[in-house]
């Protein structure tokens, strides 16, 4: 896999952080866990249940030598999501995500979680619009 990076951009590879000082292309010739700087979510951006799940899996990917705590947190958060979710699309996605995480395919799990962000937003928007307005 070939990755192009801009000057000053960072990439996280197997827990290591690399920053390049000029435009460069990197070819990854074996299986590695990596995350581009633009795909990294800050803790302050984990404002919904799916974004929190993304952040947890991101921690597992960024620190592959110490996933025990993040894995336990993932298990709790994933189970809570499955317990309250009523959307078939969301449930199917959560099952697929769990399989990917179980196989330590964190990057693919992050992609799958990102794909569910619009579904979550639609669900949240629907819930917000169904709340009856009460006059004071």
From Swiss-Prot:
One of its GO terms (biological process) is mRNA catabolic process. Transmembrane segments: none annotated. This is Probable flagellum biosynthesis repressor protein FlbT 2. It holds the Pfam family FlbT. Coiled coil: none annotated. GO terms for molecular function: mRNA 5'-UTR binding. It comes from Bradyrhizobium diazoefficiens (strain JCM 10833 / BCRC 13528 / IAM 13628 / NBRC 14792 / USDA 110). It comes from the Bacteria. Belongs to the FlbT family. Keywords: Bacterial flagellum biogenesis, Repressor, RNA-binding. Has a post-transcriptional repressor function in flagellum biogenesis. Associates with the 5'-UTR of fljK mRNA and promotes its degradation.
């Amino acid at each position: 896999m070939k990755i192009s990076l801009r000057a000053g951009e960072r990439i996280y590879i197997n827990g290591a952080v690399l920053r390049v000082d000029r435009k460069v292309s990197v070819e990854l010739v074996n299986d590695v866990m990596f995350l581009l700087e633009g795909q990294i979510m800050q803790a302050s951006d984990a404002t919904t249940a799916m974004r929190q799940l993304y952040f947890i899996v991101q921690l597992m990917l960024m620190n592959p030598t110490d996933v025990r705590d993040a894995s336990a947190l993932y298990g709790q958060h994933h189970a809570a999501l499955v317990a309250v979710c009523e959307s078939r699309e969301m449930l199917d996605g959560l099952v697929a995500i769990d399989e990917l995480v179980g196989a330590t395919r964190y990057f693919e799990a992050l992609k799958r979680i990102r794909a569910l962000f619009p579904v979550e937003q639609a669900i949240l928007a629907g819930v917000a619009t169904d709340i009856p307005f009460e006059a004071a």
